[in-house]
């Protein structure tokens, strides 16, 4: 959990990152190493060394692929734009970031200590995130006006989206 003092306003940003996942099990390699199908395969997948039908040790790394990365999710809101935020959310599969105002209202955004949609998109681009959803829109925007925020964000980060309350967003594994 990231909590940083930015311009005398406490800002909460959260990053949740899964641990790496085991590599994929290769049944063909297990058969070639004379490990019979069944409970021994499960033990190998759990990281245990097993004996094959010849009484030889077979190690998990002999039948498991490379570790696979977990997913990373970041959430940033109620803050002024700071380029350093990008480092905190770097490589996220999903960034949920406030985009309270359109570019024309940047002075008002600074005064109220919020970001524009373009500033949120700049963070997403600089952090090399996979996907970004905007949140925390100013109440001045009706549903018909929100696409303007999206358009400004997508000019910088094409994978920007608008999010809504109670919206479910899937974060798929990369592999």
Task: Give the residues covered by each predicted segment.
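Active-site-proximal loop/helix segment associated with metal-binding centers of metalloenzymes
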Residues: 1-75, 79-88, 94-96
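Binuclear metal-ion centers of metallo-dependent hydrolases, dominated by the metallo-beta-lactamase
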Residues: 81-175
């Amino acid at each position: 959990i990231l909590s940083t003092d930015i311009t005398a306003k406490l800002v909460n940003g959260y990053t949740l990152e899964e641990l790496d996942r085991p590599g994929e099990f290769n049944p063909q390699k297990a058969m070639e190493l004379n490990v019979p199908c069944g409970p021994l395969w499960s033990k190998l997948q759990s990281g245990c060394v097993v004996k094959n039908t010849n009484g030889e040790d077979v190690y998990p790394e002999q039948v498991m692929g490379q570790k696979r990365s977990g997913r990373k999710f970041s959430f940033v809101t109620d803050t002024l734009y700071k380029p350093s935020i990008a480092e905190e959310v770097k490589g996220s599969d999903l960034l949920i970031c406030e985009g309270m105002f359109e570019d024309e209202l940047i002075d008002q955004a600074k005064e109220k200590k919020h970001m524009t949609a373009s500033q949120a998109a700049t963070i997403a681009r600089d952090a090399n995130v996979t996907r970004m959803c905007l949140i925390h829109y100013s109440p001045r925007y009706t549903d018909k006006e929100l696409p303007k925020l999206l358009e400004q964000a997508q000019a910088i980060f094409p994978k920007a989206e608008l999010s809504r309350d109670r919206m479910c967003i899937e974060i798929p594994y990369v592999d």
